[in-house]
């Protein structure tokens, strides 16, 4: 495909957050009741945590947010300026400006809604032994309005795109926006993809998630989220392969594409279910001493996967690209990457 064919081919919508990342100790995790390998929304008890992190530990500030990470990684893998675009809500403040600069430098075409009254959202990333836990204080990210999406200059991004990716986290913010995008995708034979994102989404936002399920052509998630999904739906199995098959067989709103379920399992093989069959793909092994942190690993996997999907590549290539991207990211702090990919 000519590079002009890739113009705005992939659109992401989600919660743009500034990652406040630090290697912490067990005492800190216990104090704030934080479990590793989890993602939650901040409660009042977590609010002093962000300041305490910056006082006690060596903190890094990295532009993040699950969907934004994936879109940036896809953009990096594609190496075609303007191939991706992204919408979400930030505050009118220095963090928001930093986010804009970072995403634009990454080559992503961003159309943020800017909320006058609320600060840009942050996400505490607590790292211990290479594992991460996410505590998101959405702030401005929670203020995205469907009216912003409906503006002609923003809806034009929806019309231009052929692939859509929305993390499950956005279900807590603007289900109306997701509805407009998924219905457009189904009506125009475009590819709509989502992520389970976190156990709490599967558990406490089950109803809004269920409304999206028929529209999902690809469902991404990790083993913990898949097992929570299974429990919440009364499937009575913890077997990730069985869960992946069941998810791929849930009813579809449009018959254009069969649904594919893609479940990552950390260092264990990636499980892919389609057509009632399961395939497993090994990840790239990494010696423990090379692991910096797993923050952004799942996001990077999706970004790599989507970069090949928009090229029309088969599942095997998409998974290989996903594994490559996440392997790069876990050797660095946060969801960051070198200037150019080395994927061929």
UniProtKB/Swiss-Prot annotation:
Pathway: Purine metabolism; AMP biosynthesis via salvage pathway; AMP from adenosine: step 1/1. GO terms for biological process: adenosine salvage; AMP salvage; response to trehalose-6-phosphate. PROSITE patterns: PFKB_KINASES_2 (PS00584). Inactivated by the begomovirus AL2 protein or the curtovirus L2 protein. Its EC number is 2.7.1.20. InterPro entries: Adenokinase (IPR001805), Carboh/pur_kinase_PfkB_CS (IPR002173), PfkB_dom (IPR011611), Ribokinase-like (IPR029056). It is an enzyme of class 2 (transferase). GO terms for cellular component: apoplast; cytosol; plasma membrane; plasmodesma. Pfam families: PfkB. Keywords: ATP-binding, Host-virus interaction, Kinase, Magnesium, Nucleotide-binding, Purine salvage, Transferase. Belongs to the carbohydrate kinase PfkB family. ATP dependent phosphorylation of adenosine and other related nucleoside analogs to monophosphate derivatives. Essential to sustain methyl recycling. Interacts with the begomovirus AL2 protein and the curtovirus L2 protein. This is Adenosine kinase 1. The lineage of its organism: Eukaryota, Viridiplantae, Streptophyta, Embryophyta, Tracheophyta.
């Amino acid at each position: 495909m000519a590079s002009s064919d890739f113009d705005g081919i992939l659109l992401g919508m989600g919660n743009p957050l500034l990652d406040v990342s630090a290697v912490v100790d067990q005492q800190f995790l216990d104090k704030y009741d934080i479990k590793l390998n989890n993602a939650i929304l901040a409660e009042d008890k977590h609010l002093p945590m962000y300041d305490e992190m910056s006082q006690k530990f060596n903190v890094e500030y990295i532009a993040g947010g699950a969907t934004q990470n994936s879109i940036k990684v896809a953009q990096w893998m594609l190496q075609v300026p303007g191939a991706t675009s992204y919408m979400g809500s930030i505050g009118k403040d220095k963090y928001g400006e930093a986010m804009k600069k970072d995403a634009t430098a990454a080559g992503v075409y961003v159309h943020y809604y800017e909320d006058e009254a609320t600060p840009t959202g942050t996400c505490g990333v607590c790292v211990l032994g290479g594992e991460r836990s996410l505590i998101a204080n959405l702030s401005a990210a929670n203020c995205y309005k469907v009216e912003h999406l409906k503006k002609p200059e923003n809806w034009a991004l929806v019309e231009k795109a052929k692939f859509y990716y929305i993390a499950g986290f956005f279900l807590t913010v603007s289900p109306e926006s997701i509805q407009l995008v998924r219905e457009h995708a189904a009506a125009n034979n475009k590819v709509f993809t989502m992520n389970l994102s976190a156990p709490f989404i599967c558990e406490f936002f089950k109803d809004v998630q269920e409304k999206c399920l028929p529209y999902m052509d690809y469902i991404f998630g990790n083993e913990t989220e898949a097992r929570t999904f299974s429990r919440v739906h009364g499937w009575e199995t913890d077997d990730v392969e069985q869960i992946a098959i069941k998810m791929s067989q849930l009813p579809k709103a449009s018959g254009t594409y069969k649904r594919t379920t893609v479940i990552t399992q950390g260092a264990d093989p990636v499980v892919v279910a389609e057509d009632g069959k399961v395939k497993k793909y090994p990840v790239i092994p990494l010696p423990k001493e090379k692991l910096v942190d797993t923050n952004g690993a799942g996001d990077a996997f999706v970004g790599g996967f989507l970069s090949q999907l928009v090229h029309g590549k088969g599942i095997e290539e998409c998974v290989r690209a996903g594994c490559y991207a996440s392997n790069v990211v876990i050797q660095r702090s946060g969801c960051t990457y070198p200037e150019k990919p080395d994927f061929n």
